[in-house]
């Protein structure tokens, strides 16, 4: 009945496995019943031996854990690789884009030259010369009386640059050392721009740089934040018209004030500017053309949290004071409460918005009036635009367009550079005359009696009639600096008292250079975001704003303009 200690014991037989013997490692004897030993033995070892199914499940779990760790490591490696893919792709795209852009420019030049070769009299695809008396289409402009009408296709300034570079061919084409200094500074700050401009190891001015620089200057008065039905230039003309009308009695409306269409108002802008200049001269002792900059946003033109600046931000500016005084900018509850106004204006006429009524009368198809007093950034643009037009009026007053074509910046031939150190008319006569220029032999600065002719505002009237009106008709979203990008360049230079040294050039023109660089490297700045572009553009607008205020506040404005124009022509 009892088995001796350590005697081998037969385990229960399995149909699939052979019989085995096992010795129990126990110091005690093993007691079991003789009958049914296999049955009891199987129950005894059931709780101590590891079942095969349990082993299989654990192995599966460990295998899954290993696979999970391997998959996680692979995902981490893939994530690290994917982070470097955009950098390599961007670099590869740039190496492809730069040659393609160069090829496109070359093809454009070849196409332009092919058109020029077909023209016998020298008419060009983008710049056409018409004889006086011909019917003038909508896309024809005229700069000066002794010039010729010029035709453009899509954009006058860009077409003019394209044609000028095509005419020059491999010869030298100059736009003043100021632009050349800007290009040099741009290349010094970023060597990669040289490939974009295709001026590797070359000192010539780049056509692409000039187009980008002009585009940047044209955008100086554009409001990048928000959408509006009316441009700042349209609001400016409406304000000037109402301001001039308010100075005249209803029974004594002078020439230029009784207009029914907007283009007629455009033609008489010089008249409106004279009305404002008369009032400014009357208060010259206390005049300032600056805002309260402590209440303006630091890095942006428009308010960050809405469409309103802090109260009193425009108050110091003489243009704002005159517009408020004549009711051109209507009174708002921010200026005075109705309870305070009731005793002196019971009908609340001062709350009426005359600009809204004018906008609907001139632009009925837009169906939305211009509520100017509710849009502070647009009010600021109007004040800046009027200031820029006052600069233009002072610059062109009694201007002479009949001087030497190479010494007169009103003539296109002035952009074809003279030999280094040559300024004489004898040397200038050796150079070809560009389209739109009048030969020196026909130029005259005297009338039939030999008396000096005072042009006064005649050249400005002609410019608005033959240049601004056609340009506006072609693009009614154009701002003041879009018509006159040179004004922006003049004001950027004019904001500096004296002439900065070459070492300090960058800090005065960094905003313009930064905007040009952003435009040239569009693909590289995709990730910079709209805020960065907005900050750079608004910095340029602030520089122009600062420059125009200083130029209008100097005592001898004409002399200051001449100095700044010399700076632009020869570089700073």
From Swiss-Prot:
Q: Name one GO biological process term.
A: symbiont entry into host cell
Its function? Capsid vertex-specific component that plays a role during viral DNA encapsidation, assuring correct genome cleavage and presumably stabilizing capsids that contain full-length viral genomes. Participates in the interaction between the capsid and the tegument through interaction with the large tegument protein/LTP.
Name the Pfam families for this protein: Herpes_UL25 (PF01499)
Instruction: Give positions of region: Interaction with major capsid protein/MCP.
Output: 1-58
User: Keywords in UniProt for this one?
Assistant: Capsid protein, Host nucleus, Host-virus interaction, Viral genome packaging, Viral penetration into host nucleus, Viral release from host cell, Virion, Virus entry into host cell
Keyword Ion transport (UniProt): no
What gene is this protein a product of?
CVC2
Q: Name one GO cellular component term.
A: host cell
**Secretion signal: which residues?**
none
Q: Where in the cell is it found?
A: Virion; Host nucleus
Q: Which family does it belong to?
A: Belongs to the herpesviridae CVC2 protein family.
Q: Which domain of life is it from?
A: Viruses
Q: What is its main location?
A: virion
Question: InterPro entries given for it?
Answer: Herpes_UL25 (IPR002493)
Q: Quote the protein name from its UniProt record.
A: Capsid vertex component 2
Query: Does the record's keyword annotation contain ATP-binding?
Result: no
Instruction: Quote the subunit structure annotation.
Output: Heterodimerizes with CVC1. Interacts with major capsid protein/MCP and triplex capsid protein 1/TRX1 at the pentamer vertices. Interacts with the large tegument protein/LTP.
């Amino acid at each position: 009945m009892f088995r001796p200690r350590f005697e081998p014991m037969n385990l229960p037989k399995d149909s699939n496995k052979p019989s085995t013997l096992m010795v129990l490692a126990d110091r005690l004897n093993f007691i079991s019943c003789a009958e049914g030993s296999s049955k009891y033995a199987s129950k005894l070892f059931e709780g101590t031996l590891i079942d095969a199914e349990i082993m299989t499940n654990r192995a599966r779990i460990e295998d899954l854990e290993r696979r999970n760790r391997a998959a996680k490591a692979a995902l981490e490696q893939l994530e690290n690789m994917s982070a470097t893919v955009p950098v390599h792709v961007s670099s590869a795209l740039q190496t492809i884009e730069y040659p393609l852009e160069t090829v496109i420019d070359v093809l454009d030049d070849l196409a332009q030259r092919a058109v020029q070769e077909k023209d016998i009299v020298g008419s060009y695809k983008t710049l056409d010369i018409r004889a006086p008396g011909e019917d003038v289409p909508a896309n024809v402009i005229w700069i000066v009386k002794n010039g010729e009408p010029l035709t453009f296709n899509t954009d006058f300034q860009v077409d003019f640059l394209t044609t000028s570079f095509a005419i020059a061919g491999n010869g030298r084409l100059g736009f003043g050392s100021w632009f050349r200094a800007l290009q040099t500074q741009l290349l010094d700050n970023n060597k990669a721009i040289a490939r974009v401009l295709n001026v590797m190891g070359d000192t010539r001015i780049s056509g692409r740089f000039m187009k980008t620089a002009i585009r940047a200057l044209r955008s100086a008065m554009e409001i990048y934040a928000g959408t509006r039905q009316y441009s700042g230039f349209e609001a400016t003309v409406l304000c000037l018209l109402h301001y001039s009308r308010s100075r005249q009695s209803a029974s004594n409306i002078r020439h230029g004030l009784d207009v029914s269409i907007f283009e007629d108002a455009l033609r008489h802008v010089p008249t409106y500017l004279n009305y404002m200049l008369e009032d400014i001269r009357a208060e010259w002792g206390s005049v300032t053309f600056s805002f309260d900059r402590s209440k303006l946003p630091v890095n942006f033109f428009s308010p960050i949290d809405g469409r309103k600046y802090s109260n009193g931000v425009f108050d110091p500016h003489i243009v704002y004071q005159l517009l408020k005084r004549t009711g051109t900018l209507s009174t708002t509850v921010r200026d005075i409460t109705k309870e305070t106004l009731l005793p002196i204006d019971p009908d609340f006429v001062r709350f009426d918005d005359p600009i809204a009524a004018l906008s609907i009368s001139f632009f009925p198809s837009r169906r939305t009036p211009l509520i100017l007093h509710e849009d502070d950034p647009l009010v600021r643009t109007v004040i800046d635009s009027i200031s820029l037009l006052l600069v233009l009026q002072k610059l062109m007053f009694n201007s002479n367009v009949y001087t030497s074509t190479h010494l007169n910046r009103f003539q296109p031939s002035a952009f074809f550079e003279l030999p280094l150190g040559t300024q004489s008319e004898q040397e200038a006569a050796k150079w070809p005359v560009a389209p739109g220029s009048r030969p020196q032999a026909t130029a005259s600065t005297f009338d039939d009696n030999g008396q000096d002719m005072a042009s006064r505002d005649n050249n400005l009237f002609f410019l608005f009639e033959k240049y601004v009106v056609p340009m506006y008709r072609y693009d009614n979203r154009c701002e003041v600096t879009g018509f006159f990008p040179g004004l922006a360049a003049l004001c950027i230079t004019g904001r500096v008292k004296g002439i900065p040294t070459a070492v300090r050039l960058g800090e005065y023109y960094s905003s313009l250079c930064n905007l040009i660089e952003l435009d040239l490297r569009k693909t590289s700045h995709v990730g910079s975001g709209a805020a960065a572009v907005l900050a750079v553009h608004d910095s340029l607008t602030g520089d122009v704003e600062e420059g125009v205020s200083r130029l209008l506040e100097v005592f001898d404005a004409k002399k200051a303009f001449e100095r700044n124009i010399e700076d632009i022509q020869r570089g700073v």
